[in-house]
């Protein structure tokens, strides 16, 4: 299947640059995966499409303020590190900008010397392994000095960094937010629980690979990046009981979907487990556990639009995206949502 099959025209002004004042007032396109029928709602209407006994699966990862801007010791030259993943207690794999400044042995300082760093290795892919030196707790130091690593298509500064976190975010480790979850408020989640809908959590730490364009012509040739995931025993039991009763598992976001489909056996059962996944879901894949999906509007030719097309049918999805452009929906991380019912 050709990557170009997932292209569509998107005017730049439809790329949302900031979140709406109230999370659940974003628009919601409801797409029937069987008929392709489309209806236009607001996100707070999602509760009308959830039935008692269903389980909503949320990714509770938390975005780290992983962008550090500092200077080279001695010369004061500027450096930017983007923390990708922890490889040891105080060692992180990072992207460095400008790369030529970040040679092995070079030392850098951040925030009046509150945090120091040394490049200890340059990997084949150009990423750096960086050792950090600090006093206290690293997460707290990072919280005071780091900036949110917003996606490359967002050019406006984010006033409130909590708006790039879900209200239920808990486990630190992502370089990007699981954006389908940004629409939920505490109040909406409370109403959902009151209706008898279960809530289960997975953790998948979203990597920067989520923004990496597909550079091959044939989608089968694309290799996905690896991301760390975890599912607890309690949450696995909630999901298995839901399937056993004949109720639906409704995944919030492509990250929750990829986690569940990685863990599920052929019968759709899941169990407590942790690991790394590079699962790539594209048309032809048969879903084992996910029945319905809440997601945002994704980039043309992205692996995310391919995943959505696998659940709802490519023709239905491409028609829905054409309609979304015509109706001037807001796209990408701070944009509107779609429910595939």
Curated annotation (Swiss-Prot):
Family statement: Belongs to the QueA family.
Gene Ontology CC, one term: cytoplasm
Biological role stated in the UniProt entry: Transfers and isomerizes the ribose moiety from AdoMet to the 7-aminomethyl group of 7-deazaguanine (preQ1-tRNA) to give epoxyqueuosine (oQ-tRNA).
Pathway: tRNA modification; tRNA-queuosine biosynthesis
Protein EC: 2.4.99.17
Localization, UniProt: Cytoplasm
GO biological process: queuosine biosynthetic process; tRNA wobble guanine modification
Gene: queA
Main subcellular location: cytoplasm
Organism whose genome encodes this protein: Clostridium botulinum (strain Alaska E43 / Type E3)
Annotated keywords: Cytoplasm, Queuosine biosynthesis, S-adenosyl-L-methionine, Transferase
Catalysis performed (reactions): 7-aminomethyl-7-carbaguanosine(34) in tRNA + S-adenosyl-L-methionine = epoxyqueuosine(34) in tRNA + adenine + L-methionine + 2 H(+)
Top-rank taxon: Bacteria
GO molecular function annotations of the record: S-adenosylmethionine:tRNA ribosyltransferase-isomerase activity
Protein name: S-adenosylmethionine:tRNA ribosyltransferase-isomerase
Keyword S-adenosyl-L-methionine on entry: yes
